[in-house]
Curated annotation (Swiss-Prot):
This is N-acetyl-gamma-glutamyl-phosphate reductase. GO terms for molecular function: N-acetyl-gamma-glutamyl-phosphate reductase activity; NAD binding; NADP+ binding. InterPro entries: AGPR_AS (IPR023013), AGPR_type-1 (IPR000706), NAD(P)-bd_dom_sf (IPR036291), NAGSA_dehydrogenase (IPR050085), Semialdehyde_DH_NAD-bd (IPR000534). Catalyzes the NADPH-dependent reduction of N-acetyl-5-glutamyl phosphate to yield N-acetyl-L-glutamate 5-semialdehyde. Pfam families: Semialdhyde_dh (PF01118), Semialdhyde_dhC_1 (PF22698). It catalyses: N-acetyl-L-glutamate 5-semialdehyde + phosphate + NADP(+) = N-acetyl-L-glutamyl 5-phosphate + NADPH + H(+). It comes from Cyanothece sp. (strain PCC 7425 / ATCC 29141). The gene is argC.
Amino acid sequence: MSSQGKVPVGIVGASGYGGVQLVRLLVDHPHLELAYLGGEGSAGRPYTDLYPHLQGCVDLLVEPVDLEAIAARCAVVFLALPNGLAVDLAPTLLQRGCRVLDLSADYRFSELKTYTLWYGKERQDQAVAATAVYGLPELYRDRIAEAQLIGCPGCYPTASLLALSPLMKQGLIVPETAIIDAKSGTSGGGRQGKINLLLAEAEGSLGAYNVGHHRHTPEIEQICSDLAGHEVMVQFTPHLIPMPRGILATVYATLRDPGLEREDLLTIYRAFYRNSPWVKILPSGTYPQTKWACGTNLCYIGIEVDSRTGRVIVMSAIDNLLKGQSGQAVQCLNLMMGWEETLGLPQLAFYP
């Protein structure tokens, strides 16, 4: 604990969008103290050189990644790094007694062969990976509370799984008919310069990418299979939309009981998420918009039934950088520490 009685926290990979969102949340959190910011590319520079708008709020330098120094100063470490790097850091930090929350894909999979197949990296940390808990609180709240290592979900899986989970868990749909059409703002691509994310390329344009082979597909399928109790495959197609942040996922699936109506499903969803303060089930005939979630840790869900086709349509909207990434990680930490899971997290959107 710090001299103020707060829990000291560090971020490795603080220079990206995920890192700066964490900084914002941790600075405002009543029980946490930002004690370390790490990153190789920006080491030695004041953090405010990277983000000048934080002048007067953050006075830390970005430091080289030194695991012994991090463990000596931090009780909790967020790893906000590209895929494939956390596996080299997490085991040592855990051995030194730190709680670790990994925002990459490295600790999301129960089967490491699935990770290797989709991410191309062989793993030597099977024992550590087996201790990781998938960090979606609405499904695994109790397990998260007891964990030392959290594999925080991806942004698309968060929006998709919150829309799908009640249907899968209660056997309301034919699982193999599930289709996920999801659209994300450009911040999901990170802060590095990429041609397709340039204003001149993205503005006024909408397009799909990684069709049929996006890396978030097996992550979604793993959790759907866990909920359904058998192997499930889904069709997932992501799209890039010309706005900075937000995800809208629209899920389609065939109902097992074509007699189910919208009000039936609204009742089921409200019951399923009754203890989930960050999920808002919208009234009948109201469908979510990304702007409502912008800057918050909320997920808005709307539901419709097409009686003509026998399909249910579920729409979910989140902020990809908060509920889809950093906000959800802090939500998990709140549970790990025994605090209210809403603590220190924004509930009101930037609007308009």
